[in-house]
């Protein structure tokens, strides 16, 4: 029994991005081809989306509770009082660089609870 194009598209649509990437690699190896576009222009930006694994925690603004934010920065970074205060006063500043998604979300939560505005990049 042969699958129709619609059945194939439906099956691919149910896969995660990671599974589709693995499928593409397997097809490239099996058929000896590449999925790269020959001369892609700016309009043909069909890049495979990969999930980001490393994040930077950026302190955007200290907010009203600056003392609490300084305490949170010290706790997260291990900086001294002076260095943590300089980081908070100089916002926007990177508080944590190249951390996992879970660690970045934890840091963001702690800083926001202290009253800061935070972004993950």
From Swiss-Prot:
InterPro entries: Ribosomal_bL12, Ribosomal_bL12_C, Ribosomal_bL12_C/ClpS-like, Ribosomal_bL12_oligo, Ribosomal_bL12_oligo_N_sf. GO terms for molecular function: mRNA binding; structural constituent of ribosome. It comes from the Bacteria. GO terms for biological process: translation. Keywords: Ribonucleoprotein, Ribosomal protein. Pfam families: Ribosomal_L12, Ribosomal_L12_N. Transmembrane segments: none annotated. Gene3D superfamilies: 3.30.1390.10, Single helix bin (1.20.5.710). GO terms for cellular component: cytosolic large ribosomal subunit. Belongs to the bacterial ribosomal protein bL12 family. Homodimer. Part of the ribosomal stalk of the 50S ribosomal subunit. Forms a multimeric L10(L12)X complex, where L10 forms an elongated spine to which 2 to 4 L12 dimers bind in a sequential fashion. Binds GTP-bound translation factors. HAMAP family: Ribosomal_bL12 (MF_00368). Forms part of the ribosomal stalk which helps the ribosome interact with GTP-bound translation factors. Is thus essential for accurate translation. This is Large ribosomal subunit protein bL12. The lineage of its organism: Bacteria, Pseudomonadati, Pseudomonadota, Gammaproteobacteria, Pseudomonadales.
């Amino acid at each position: 029994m042969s699958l129709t194009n619609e059945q194939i598209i439906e099956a691919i649509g149910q896969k995660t991005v990671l599974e589709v990437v693995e499928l593409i690699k397997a097809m490239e190896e099996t058929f000896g081809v590449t999925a790269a576009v020959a001369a892609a222009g700016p309009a043909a930006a069909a890049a495979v989306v990969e999930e980001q694994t490393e994040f930077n925690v950026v302190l955007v603004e200290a907010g009203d509770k600056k003392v609490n934010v300084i305490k949170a920065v010290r706790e997260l970074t291990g900086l001294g009082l002076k260095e943590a205060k300089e980081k908070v006063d100089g916002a926007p500043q990177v508080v944590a660089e190249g951390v996992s998604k879970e660690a970045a979300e934890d840091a963001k939560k702690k800083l926001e609870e202290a009253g800061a505005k935070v972004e993950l990049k």
